[in-house]
Amino acid sequence: MAEWQTECMLPPTQPGFEGVGPHPGRVLQNTSGNIQSYSDTLAHTDPTGRDDHFSHYGFKYPHQPPVPTHPMPTTTGLHPQQVINNRFHTKKLRRLQSLGPNLIGPRRTRSYLKSQKYIEYRARPRRDTGKDGEPVWSDELEDAFQQALEANPPMGRRKWSERGKSYGRNELIAEYIYKTTGKRRSRKQVSSHLQVLDSFLKGDPDWERLVREQPADRSNGQPPSAGPRWRNSLELPFSSHYNSHNYPSYHDSLRPVQSYSGELPPPHVVFHPNLHAEATNINKIYGLSFDMWVSAPNQPGGIESAFHLYTRLQGDQRHPAPPKRLENIPNWRTSFPHLNSVMADVNNPLNCDIILLEANLRLMDDFPPSGSKLGIQLELDFTQPPNGDALTNQMENWSCSTYIYEEGQNIYRARQDLPKQQSNKVKPPFESTWWAKRFTELTEIAKDRQLNELADRQTRDYFRTLTAVQEIRATPSSRRVSNQYPDNSQDDSKRMAILLWQFRQTRSNEVGTTTWRRVTSPSSDRNTIPSPKPVTGIDLPPLSFYANSLARPAPSIYQAPQSHDLVHHNGTSQPQWSMYQPPQDSIFNANGGFDLLNSITKPEGGLHDKTAVTSVLDTYPNLQPEVSQPTSLNGSNGGPGMLSIPDMSLSHTNLNAYNLSGHDNHYGTPQHPGVSVPDNSHVLNNGIFGSSTQSIDDMSQTHAPWPTPTSSITDVGSSNYSHLQFSDHHVPSVSRESHQPNHFEVLLGPDDLIVGSMPGDPGINGAAHGHMNHTYTENNAVEAA
């Protein structure tokens, strides 16, 4: 069976000068300041093979490169490669002339670059560093800065309007630098750099021409008709834009500092693979961080104290793997149903980043000590717009919707509001409550591999069918809605990013790694992606998954348990451990760390038209699947609608469950038993995860300590675990009554929903509404984080 291999996230290397043109022996001259004589020599030689340098001549020579007036050689008698070169050469000249005088006009010399003060300034060691850890004005950025001065003529106090926004000259220079190098420099940094250079270059005619308006331009009172000279060239198609450099690399003789090797990297090769998306969506995901680990008890909850690492983002976070087209992802429509519905919505075109994350998870071979915590931190870094204004000043009301699928079936859905961001970094939760439950079950399977070799294959098959989609949305701030979003409707939230998750299990000798890459699916190319066929007739419930399962048994990893598949555990129970103590606020700061410790927001309305869990997991259903929302937790028709949450029971009698320690949670007495969610996961537990004698309940965000295991199930009142509160949905309040000691519970508000189940307990079903609990085995409760 083929295993999914991880890919290294190395940035594409730039081609060297050795393979450019028929002059490989001039490499050292080109990188050591002799570009003047080198270009003069090349100007009188055959241009074949030097197509990448034609755009440089527009700035170098006072006249346009003449179009050959003599007849071009015919294809008769020429080598095919020569024919291709001739055609390509003619096309380049035609494109170069089509750009007009903005780029091919005469370029004056810049004598200030040879001044003694400028040479001494550039010879200084670069001590100041930017947010990216590199010198603020390295040689590469200085080259781009000098090019930007040429490409953006002085405009005084006037503004350049584009895409409904106004840009000053410094903002245009900052955007030019970013598009050319992929490195962000703010408007204030550009302004400061101009002031530093102006302090010792003021008075130089060439410098004055680049930084101050000429009297002739000022007398007109209008900006140049062509605007910034580089804007049109960057709007060329993607392929032609990268194959022709329209901006000369800044080199000059007498330059004291050795220039960086190679030319300026082609813009957007790594950072922005799609120019159309850049033009319609300024806020891009520039970096990403993701870790999933288990930290030791009585240790800080950070990854520094982790003793097991499930997975971690591999390589440079700001240099993802090469982009991938959406149609090249196998079965993306069934693997990511939410994305499929978004792509099919013609009234709301997709204009945000799509990120594909492929996570290799390394499972644990045994349970961790009692009190261990599961940590998951996910962080997105949105780039700063060219005007230097922070992204959070433009957007507010950030939210994250998470959809988890097994074989295309939605098994989990949650929406959470994100705290107010203080920077461009957004920290969406990744449902550690759900993962803690899964890891507990999968850890038990890994522990029993010697007894059941089929368990390893079942676990791997399970991860292959597991996918997730996360949608990040935000609302434009009130002071910007009127002028930037004039056509906003009642729901004026904007889709900021979509994350696609695929999972695999590592081999025994591998470490868990995660890669991420952009998925290219621009709005302009949506017609190339086949959309679902329009509905013709009466709308019926979808039959793609349910009808086939009713007609014949579908292959699934959740098979009915067989006698030879069940693993019986005859070992003695492990010793009892004390419950995990209430967490301290120092574990994670909600304002500074990853805010994954708050309660889950899981509105009931988010699970509309969801088939009952028993119908989804049962391989041989006998009844018509339910498509209506249950109105109560025990299946009755009375009472207000409650959220039905399946309980994932544990099958190992010696199982240590995750404890979840929460930042804002408190501890109180548990409740009396009441209405609970029916145990709808027995097929899953008995099929892939073995026989079930215990249950593990919902867990909160970010942390999950393992508590005490037991070998028997106590009665209903012996131990309880309360779910975290669900926002955006009002449910009947639950009474807080005293109960037996030595149990764990989270104090919830008056509108919180407490749900739970005890598999196989006859005394729990049929209880009245308003008295709900989530039972768990004695001394094996789950602490919420």
Swiss-Prot record:
Signal peptide: none annotated. It comes from the Eukaryota. Keywords: Activator, Conidiation, Nucleus, Sporulation, Transcription, Transcription regulation. Residues 1-22, 213-232 are annotated as: Disordered. It is found in: Nucleus. One of its GO terms (cellular component) is nucleus. The keyword Translocase does not apply. One of its GO terms (biological process) is sporulation resulting in formation of a cellular spore. Belongs to the TEC1 family. This is Conidiophore development regulator abaA. It comes from Aspergillus oryzae (strain ATCC 42149 / RIB 40) (Yellow koji mold).
